[in-house]
Every structure is written in structure tokens, then in C-alpha cells.
Regions:
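Gram-negative bacterial Sec-dependent N-terminal signal peptides
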Residues: 1-22
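Proteolytic maturation boundary segments
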Residues: 23-53, 235-275, 286, 317, ...
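M16 family metallopeptidases and their MPP-like homologs
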Residues: 55, 60-78, 82-86, 100-147, ...
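Short, conserved charged micro-motifs
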Residues: 134-136, 236-240, 295, 352-356, ...
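A common structural junction motif
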Residues: 142-152, 247-254, 363-373, 618-624, ...
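Short, conserved secondary-structure transition motifs
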Residues: 163-171, 262-276, 382-393, 603-604, ...
Length: 958
């Protein structure tokens, strides 16, 4: 559906509009690609009104269980904003016959890709489970649909009000975090169901009562207002009796009256200027246009994609690449039922005249609306998006799989085949229709928002930690209360025994694909695994580089080089690269992580050869043009400023260098962006030399997963990489012998006045390498802090309500690995939260070791979820690369069940106790020092004040 494709476009790159040279071969036609997108399914409806969609996909022993309710924030009346989302949280706190946390059950049945989300038009809940646990999942979903009311308590409600309030604060605390409130509150008039944000008002949330929540459930959570999708190792004949068994006896609920709301138009242009802690000025242009079912929406989607969504978009070409007055530009459409949001935004280059950029943006937009896109632009939009949809068909559930496509169509327009019709519309789009739609809808009055660097207004909070950012909103004029029938959805029509939880009936074995190996004539090793569920192929050419290869005085060079490799080759401009990708429906990218630099390709099978040509050109022949280098430098410097303007960015930049020391390969910011002064000093010769010595055939390995064979792919790789040689010697091995500083327990406090939350990041470099067997240690950490059900998350989030989410993790690395704890917490509980983390770690290593129940849950959950973990070819590709990095055999995934089953509580306790010493943890806290420091002083640890701006290579020496 367009909705899914639009969200994918939010992450797309940018490039120039020069005409690419003709391809040696003709790419597959768009119509052929559309034919490959197919989700056959059966539909049936229970007597109580529950609509059920079943799609059969036997590639793995898993089933996606996804349930969508026709209720969202649009259904919230006056004084109850945020209730739809708050109730989504309540749904995870246990039902009458499944008491306790919902995730307690999903963990022990091996669920993957699980969550719940709320948006304007819907609330959904989803999980992918082993086939043997399907009945378990149906029991859980049906129990919270039909048997929730008696399990909802004031204590649970109060806790989730705290959790959601901290979720809101966490979002508001990000750069540009307040813009969406201004957009919805201005574009949609008072009384429109989209006038307020989904997260709602803290004032309204704090006033929520137990009766409010129970009535919300009664009014909206009947089976007749829901769609259940089962996709995977199941068919309708198997599904019907199970669905009837668990859902059939739930009584029909109240009918939810449809919401009817016209598309609003502003009376006149509105200009708003906001201040925020942002690296540069951002300019917005916003309109409301028709909802997702309107034919004009498809045309607008195409037009906006060509304007600012494609890698070759016009905005990026003109403002970012040619005129270089901006460091980023995008345009996209987010579709909803009662109106869609058009968002066009430009990030002004630091030092450029924002007024001039805004004027130029409006000129470009006016010209584009007048002339429309070219036929080739329309074709590239269609090809690239349909190819992405094909790739998405590999996943049955999750946030964007086949279950989502079916459910959205059925819920929003009453047609589960809507995804196919949308793609057919996309393939048939014409420039004339696109131009007409833009002239009709984008010439109306516009909302112009400008966010400038500066201090945002003081974040106000009132008693009991509640406050209001969106204000108390009027009742939507188009809100229609549910029918007045006196029935409760919690009352069953007849008895169904729910006294015993249906445990999984077995443990499906993981069938990890066989990895074949070969070697090209120049010595490059190739590793191949076949996955043919969809006609796509993924290729990763991995180099032993990464930002651990950055010299200490050139931190950021690996990231700069990676970006530059896609910005033009000796035969193609950056625009021509982007346009070629779009014509082929391919995705070519280069990126660096800590230990590796990887050039990746996702290709549709019919265009594999042409796509490999492009990948090879990007790897072997980058031009590193000086003008492109200067533009990329400004973008990277702006990225550094952006990282320094958000709490998490500050923390992950500052703490790792202190832990490892500035001379260690891991002693730079873990974002890989480097420091402003090192990036400013990197010259073209530096980048060329780095590429010559690190992107070298002697440091390369090729990984391939997809719908091909080693016999077919090897000759294709041999032609493109087998004769590749270099006159230069490869770079020497990274110097991991550099000593890591002795760990020191202290608190580093970075002051951010008026911050609504504090960000706590704690760390320790462990005496362990990534190639060591860390499974036992990671299993112990899963219980301590690595999982939603972990001790620290359940304490700080589910018991105390001080945080939206807390985690600890043991990162992967080629050399010594770090242990981190991450906790965004409300300001007035910062000190107590740190004490909780310290005490929990001490207790874990001492008086409260791993329990038998925790061990069983960890073993069972990890074993059962193995088939779901490797459903997608991208996961197989990632596992292959991880195995190679960590010197493991390629059948490692298939040995995991045995390894987990062999774990003992004593082994987990010993692993954590030996490796993670609470007295050696370094703490970095970003927050309002005036409010936070007195709390921290009570902990008795040394406190060092660190200036927020002092984030240079010199300031991060150990």
C-alpha cells in the first residue's frame, strides 16, 4: 500500500537530476514487477462480526497473528486525548485468564516481531509465533478482547499513565520534537478528529480514571470492530476451528459509528517560527490533502516522491547538490483515512540565508506544480517502490509484512486486496494526472513552519509530574459516540474453558540455509545461501574497515568515505547512480559500522546483472569529486551538531571514548561521525588513500542471499570482482593492542536546562571479545536488562513508571565488547533511578541470582523463536556476516537450541559476576543539572560537570 511505501521513502537518499547514460540492457517492465506482488488469502466472518483473513505461506514454521481494531486517536472526545494509546498500553498488562504481563506469555511461546501501535485511525497488536504456538497466541489475543475488564486495576492504570507520560517527554525532548503538535493543531481545525496528536495531552492523561478505561474498552474493543489476520504456516481450513474456538464465544460489541470529516483547507497562508536546540534551521511546507482511498492521493504520492522522495529528487538536486544552500531536503505524503499530510522540508546549510532558501524552495515548488514530473520520473517512482514492496513480501507479519497489507486495506476501505489496486494505480500513473492533482491541492493556502536554532520555550509541568503541551482539546465536531446498546464485550455467549493456558505443542526445528563457499580468481571469498521466497537477491561486499579504522586524528573518515562512494564514480554522477537504481528497482548503499565497511545491494531477480554492474562501479571506481566532498563534509558537520543537540547523541558520543581511551580503535564517537575539527581537516587525498588501502580486494568478502544459485551467481561476481586488483598494499591490521584505561566509577553530568527528562548511559569495557563465546553472558544480561521483561525495565517502567523503557546490552565488536545501561527517566527521579540500576546490578551478582523461572523462560523463549528470527533473507545475511566476524561456523544458528538448553542458572550468575562489576561502572547523565545534581550527590559517587559544547577529540581523552 502507499502507506507502507511512503514510510519507506522517509529513509531514502538523495542525488542529482542529470540524465543517466542508457543502460546496456533494458530493465524489467513495471507491469512485470507488479505481477510479482501477490498475497492470496481467504476471508471469513464469525457470527459476532470478527473479520478473519488467512494467508498461507509455508516457507517457515511460523504464523503472524495480527489484530487491528477500528479505533484510534480520532475517536477521542474532549478531555480524553491520548486515551486510545493509553489503552493500548493497558492491553499489555494482563487479562482475566492470562494475568500478569502479556510479554511473559509471548516470551515463553517464542514470539518475534511483536508490539502494539496506535495512530489516528487504528490500534493494532501483532506477534509472529512458531506454528506450534498458534493456539497459544489466539488464546492470548482473544482473552484480552473478551476478558479484560476484571483484570484492569487502578494500580495498572496509574503505572501506565506514568509510562506514557515519560514516552511523551522522551519524544518531546528530541530536536524538532514539538513540531508535530503545531502541524496537527494548525492544519486541522478545532473539532476535526485529527486536530490533536495521538500521544495526547499530559493533563488529559493524568486525569484518566478506571471507569474511563473500562468504558473505552466496552465502546471500541468488540469483535465486530476488529480484523484478525493469520499469515504463514496455516490455511483457512486449519484456522477456522481455532478462531471459532477462541473468539467465537465473545459477544458482539457496540457498533462504532463511522467518523466523517471533510478535508480541511486553511483560510490563508500561516507562518510560524519556533526555536529549538537544533543544528540548523529547518523549513516546512504543509498541506492536508485527500485521504488514502482518493485517486488523487496516489498521484500526489508520485509527485511528492519525484520532488523529494527519490534518491534523484528535484529538491535535493537543486538545493543540496547544485546550489549547496541546504544539507537535506525531502517531500513525502503520509496517508490517513480522513485526510493525508503533505510534508516538504529543507534543512538550511549552516551559514546560508534561510530567507533566501525559503524563497528558492517556493520557486522550485511553484515551477514543479506548473510543469509536473517527467514520464521517466513517474516510471522511476513506480519501479523503485514496487521493488521495495516485493522485498517486503518476504515477511509475514511485524511492522510491514503481508499481514499489514491485508489488514490496512480491509480496515480502511473494506477491501483486503487494496494493496494490489494501489500498486496497479502506481504502475499506471501518468504525468498529466500527477500535475493536475498537485495543481488542485498544492496551490491552496499553506502552513509554513520555520524551526530556528535557539532555546525552546520552557517545558511546563504541573503537580504530580503531569503537564500539557497540546492543551485541552475541544470535542471533535465529527465524533459520533458508540451505539447505546446495553451490552458488554466481556460477557461470553456460552462457556469456553480458559482455565488452562494452551502451551506450544512442540518445538519446530530451525532450518537455516546451507552456506556454500567459493573463491574468485583474485582470492575474494564468496559465501552464498539460497532463499527463494521472493524474487530478490541481497549482496553484501564487506571490507575489514569500519570506523575502528579511523586514525585518531581523522575520526569520521570512514563515514565520510562511505558516503562519498555513492556520490559519483568515474563514469556516473551521483544523480546517474540514483536514477539507475530507481530504473532497476535496486537499492545500492555503502555504510560503515564499528568494525566493517559494507557495500550492499538489494536487487529484483530480473535486474540482477545490471544491479551488480552498478554495485561494482560504486565500490571500485568512486570519483571523490572535490565539490561533492565539500558538500558531504558540511552534511557530516551538521550531523555532528545534530548529535550534540539530542541527549542520546551526546551520550553515545561522549561515553565510549572515555571508556576505551582516545588512542584505541574504538575510542571515537560510536556514531562514527567523528569530531568537528577532525572532519574539517580531512582532505580529498586523505579519503582517496583511505579507500585505496581499506576498500581493497585483500580485505573483501562477499555474502549473497536470495533467489539464485552459487552456480549462477559466481560467474556474475567473477566478471565484476574477480579481476579486481590494487597497486597499493592493504592497510595494516587495526591496533587493538592499545591499552584500555582502568575503569573508574564516577558520574559525568552534562547540563541541559529545562530538559523534561534525564538520559542515563552507563558503561564498562568488558574483558571479553566478540569472538569469545558470549551466549551465556548475553543470556544473563537478557534477564537483567536486555529484554522488556528484564529486571531493570520491569522495575523502572512497569513498577515505578519513571521511564518509557530501560535496557542494558552487550554490544558486538571484533575486539573487547562494552556493557551499557540506557535509561531515559523523568527528571525528578533521576537520582533514585540511578540507585535502582546500581542496586539491581549488585543484587543480580549477589543476593538475588537468576531464578529457575527466569532461566526456564529465557531458554524456552530463545529456542522457540529461532525460526522467526531467520524468516527474512536480510536476517540470514546478517547472521552470515556476524558468524564470519566472530570466527564462528556458518551452522552456528542451528547449534543455538542445544546451547540454550544447556544453560544453567549457576553459569549465568558466574558469567555476569565475573564480567560486570558494579563498582567499575562509569555513568554519564544528560539533564537539567540544577534539578538533577542534588539527587546524584546522595549516591556518594564523584560527580564531574561537563560542558555540553565541549565535545572535541581533545575533550574526550581518557
Amino acid at each position: 500500500m502507499i502507506r507502507k511505501l511512503t514510510l519507506a521513502l522517509l529513509m531514502s537518499g538523495t542525488a542529482l537530476t542529470a540524465q543517466a547514460p542508457a543502460l546496456a540492457q533494458t530493465p524489467a517492465p513495471v507491469s512485470k514487477l507488479v505481477d510479482a506482488v501477490n498475497i492470496p488469502h481467504e476471508k471469513f466472518t464469525l457470527d459476532n462480526g470478527l473479520t478473519v483473513l488467512v494467508h498461507e505461506d509455508r516457507k517457515a514454521p511460523i504464523v503472524a497473528v495480527s489484530i487491528w481494531y477500528g479505533v484510534g486517536s480520532k475517536n477521542e472526545p474532549k478531555g480524553k486525548t491520548g486515551y486510545a494509546h493509553l489503552f493500548e498500553h493497558i492491553m499489555f498488562n494482563g487479562s482475566e485468564n492470562a494475568p500478569g504481563d502479556y510479554f511473559e506469555y509471548t516470551k515463553k511461546i517464542g514470539a518475534t516481531d511483536l508490539n502494539g501501535t496506535t495512530w489516528l485511525d487504528r490500534t493494532n497488536y501483532f506477534q509472529t509465533v512458531p506454528t506450534t504456538a498458534l493456539e497459544s497466541a489466539l488464546f492470548l489475543e482473544s482473552d484480552r478482547m473478551g476478558y479484560l475488564l476484571n483484570a484492569v486495576s487502578k494500580e495498572k492504570l496509574d503505572n501506565q499513565i506514568g509510562v506514557v507520560s515519560n514516552e511523551k517527554r522522551q519524544g518531546d525532548n528530541q530536536p524538532f520534537g514539538l513540531v508535530s503538535y503545531t502541524q496537527s493543531g494548525t492544519l486541522f481545525p478545532v473539532g476535526h478528529p485529527y486536530h490533536h496528536s495521538t500521544i495526547g495531552s499530559l493533563e488529559d492523561l493524568s486525569a484518566a480514571s478506571l471507569d474511563d478505561m473500562k468504558n473505552w474498552f466496552i465502546d471500541h474493543y468488540g469483535p465486530n470492530n476488529a480484523i484478525l489476520v493469520l499469515a504463514g504456516d496455516i490455511n483457512a481450513a486449519q484456522a477456522k476451528p481455532l478462531v471459532e474456538k477462541w473468539f467465537g464465544k465473545i459477544k458482539r460489541g457496540k457498533d462504532v459509528a463511522p467518523v466523517n470529516a471533510p478535508v480541511p483547507t486553511l483560510e490563508k497562508d500561516i507562518k510560524i517560527v519556533m526555536k529549538d536546540k537544533v543544528p540548523t534551521t529547518r523549513i516546512y511546507r504543509n498541506w492536508v490533502v485527500p485521504g488514502l482511498a482518493d485517486p488523487d492521493t496516489n498521484s500526489l504520492f508520485v509527485g511528492l516522491s519525484a520532488l523529494g522522495g527519490l534518491s534523484s529528487s528535484r529538491l535535493d538536486n537543486i538545493l543540496v547538490r547544485q546550489e549547496q544552500t541546504a544539507v537535506g531536503a525531502s517531500a513525502y505524503l503520509i496517508p490517513f483515512v480522513h485526510g493525508s499530510l503533505v510534508n516538504i522540508q529543507v534543512d538550511v546549510k549552516p551559514g546560508a540565508d534561510a530567507d533566501a532558501v525559503a524563497k528558492r524552495l517556493d520557486q522550485i515548488l511553484a515551477d514543479y506544480i506548473k510543469t509536473g514530473p517527467t514520464a521517466e520520473e513517474v516510471q522511476r517512482v513506480a519501479t523503485s517502490n514496487i521493488a521495495a514492496q516485493i522485498d517486503g513480501l518476504e515477511q509475514v507479519g511485524g511492522f510491514g509484512g503481508k499481514a499489514v497489507a491485508l489488514a490496512e486495506g480491509q480496515l480502511y476501505v473494506g477491501d483486503s486486496d487494496f494493496y494490489k489496486k494501489e500498486l496497479q494505480r502506481l504502475a499506471a500513473a501518468k504525468p498529466t494526472a500527477v500535475k493536475a492533482a498537485m495543481q488542485k491541492w498544492l496551490t491552496r493556502p499553506v502552513l509554513e513552519i520555520r524551526v530556528e536554532p535557539g532555546e525552546r520555550e520552557v517545558y511546563k509541568e504541573v503537580a504530580a509530574g503531569a503537564g500539557s503541551r497540546t492543551g485541552t482539546l475541544s470535542s471533535p465536531a465529527f465524533y459520533a459516540p458508540p451505539g447505546s446498546e446495553d451490552n458488554l464485550v466481556s460477557s461470553p455467549l456460552s462457556f469456553q474453558d480458559r482455565s488452562t493456558f494452551p502451551e506450544p505443542t512442540g518445538t519446530p526445528a530451525l532450518d537455516f540455509p546451507t552456506v556454500e563457499e567459493t573463491t574468485l580468481s583474485n582470492g575474494i571469498k564468496v559465501f552464498f545461501a539460497r532463499r527463494a521466497a521472493v524474487p530478490t537477491v541481497r549482496v553484501a561486499v564487506s571490507f575489514n574497515a569500519g570506523y575502528a579504522a579511523d586514525p585518531a586524528d581523522k575520526r569520521g573518515i570512514a563515514s565520510m568515505m562511505s558516503t562519498m562512494m555513492s556520490e559519483g564514480t568515474t563514469s556516473l554522477t551521483s544523480t546517474q547512480i540514483a536514477e539507475t537504481e530507481e530504473k532497476l528497482g535496486a537499492d545500492v548503499s555503502v555504510g560503515s559500522s564499528l568494525d566493517r565497511t559494507v557495500a550492499s545491494l538489494r536487487a529484483v531477480k530480473p535486474n540482477l546483472g545490471l544491479s551488480l554492474d552498478l554495485l561494482a562501479d560504486v565500490i571500485k571506481n568512486p570519483a571523490f569529486a572535490t565539490n561533492e566532498l565539500e558538500r558531504v563534509r558540511v552534511q557530516q558537520l551538521t550531523r555532528i551538531k545534530s548529535e550534540n543537540n539530542q541527549p542520546q547523541g551526546i551520550a553515545v558520543r561522549r561515553l565510549p571514548p572515555l571508556l576505551y581511551g582516545k588512542g584505541h580503535p574504538y575510542g571515537g564517537p560510536q556514531t562514527g561521525s567523528g569530531y568537528a575539527e577532525t572532519v574539517a581537516a580531512i582532505g580529498r587525498d586523505d579519503v582517496v588513500n583511505f579507500h585505496t588501502s581499506w576498500v581493497h580486494p585483500a580485505k573483501a568478502e562477499i555474502f549473497v542471499v536470495g533467489d539464485t544459485s552459487l552456480k549462477e551467481i559466481k560467474p556474475m561476481l567473477e566478471v565484476r570482482f574477480g579481476k579486481w586488483t590494487s597497486n597499493a598494499a592493504p592497510a595494516p591490521a587495526k591496533n587493538f593492542a592499545v591499552a584500555v584505561p582502568a575503569p573508574e566509577s564516577r558520574i559525568l553530568l552534562i547540563d541541559r536546562p529545562n530538559s523534561p527528562q534525564s538520559l542515563v548511559l552507563a558503561g564498562l569495557v568488558l574483558d571479553a571479545k566478540g569472538s569469545d563465546d558470549l551466549l551465556t553472558l548475553r543470556a544473563a544480561n537478557e534477564i537483567f536488562g536486555g529484554d522488556f521483561l528484564s529486571r531493570i525495565n520491569m522495575d523502572l517502567r512497569e513498577t515505578k513508571g519513571w521511564s518509557y523503557g530501560v535496557r542494558s546490552q552487550i554490544n558486538g565488536a571484533e575486539d573487547r565488547v562494552p556493557f551499557y545501561m540506557f535509561a531515559p527517566v523523568q527528571t525528578n527521579q533521576t537520582g533514585p533511578s540511578v540507585k535502582v540500576l546500581i542496586d539491581q546490578l549488585k543484587d543480580f551478582n549477589g543476593v538475588k541470582p537468576v531464578t529457575a523461572a527466569e532461566l526456564e523462560k529465557t531458554i524456552k523463549g530463545n529456542v522457540l523463536k529461532l525460526p522467526g528470527n531467520y524468516e527474512q533473507s536480510s536476517a540470514v545475511l546478517g547472521q552470515m556476516q556476524s558468524d564470519r566476524l566472530n570466527k564462528r561456523p556458518f551452522n552456528y544458528a542451528e547449534t543455538l537450541a542445544g546451547k540454550y538448553n544447556g544453560l544453567t542458572a549457576a553459569a549465568l550468575n558466574d558469567a555476569m559476576r565475573v564480567k560486570v562489576d558494579p563498582s567499575k561502572i562509569t555513568w554519564l547523565i544528560v539533564g537539567d543539572a540544577a534539578k538533577v545534581k542534588p539527587q546524584l550527590e546522595a549516591l556518594g559517587l564523584p560527580i564531574e560537570m561537563v560542558t555540553e559544547a565541549a565535545n572535541t577529540s581533545a575533550s574526550n581523552s581518557a
